[in-house]
């Protein structure tokens, strides 16, 4: 996927929210929002796929530790439409990561037990309009 926005040296604590607002491209194949320590250590890889990597209208979540991907977790809900404007809110605690989008909340285990988010990256067919930390 094409590298997009990358933010480093963050200090997002448990219970705080990372909000990413933007627009899904009208011909989107997929995009991802990654949070964690750095590009090789991710608490969450959140990857809505319209039509890529053999998946159609599927949200794939995963973690990455020292450059090695964990087991993919495919979600049944797919609340995204090509061309839509969307706000994605990511929060976490010691046990899990929550991703809130309009109409759906996704949950994924905090497999690495990470205690803060230091890194955010948005890749693929998504145009970032705003980022907010709260």
From Swiss-Prot:
PROSITE patterns: GALECTIN. The modification N-acetylmethionine is found at residue 1. SMART domains: Gal-bind_lectin, GLECT. GO terms for cellular component: extracellular space. Keywords: Acetylation, Lectin. InterPro entries: ConA-like_dom_sf, Galectin-like, Galectin_CRD. Pfam families: Gal-bind_lectin. Mainly in the liver (adult), mainly in the muscle (embryo). A beta-D-galactoside binds at residues 69-75. One of its GO terms (molecular function) is laminin binding. It comes from the Eukaryota. Residues 4-134 form the Galectin domain. PANTHER family: GALECTIN, GALECTIN-1. This protein binds beta-galactoside. Its physiological function is not yet known. It may be involved in the regulation of differentiation. Homodimer. This is 16 kDa beta-galactoside-binding lectin. It comes from Gallus gallus (Chicken).
């Amino acid at each position: 996927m094409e590298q997009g926005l990358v933010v480093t040296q963050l200090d997002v604590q448990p219970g705080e929210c990372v909000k990413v607002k933007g627009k899904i491209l009208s011909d989107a194949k997929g995009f991802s929002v990654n949070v964690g320590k750095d590009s090789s250590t991710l608490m969450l890889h959140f990857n809505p796929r319209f039509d890529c990597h053999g998946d159609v209208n599927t949200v794939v979540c995963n973690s990455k530790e020292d450059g090695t991907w964990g087991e993919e977790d495919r979600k049944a809900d797919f609340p995204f439409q090509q061309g839509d404007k969307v706000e994605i809110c990511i929060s976490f605690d010691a046990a899990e990561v929550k991703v809130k989008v309009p109409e759906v909340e996704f949950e994924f285990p905090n497999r690495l037990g990470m205690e803060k988010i230091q890194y955010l990256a948005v890749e693929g067919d998504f145009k970032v309009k705003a980022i907010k930390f709260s």
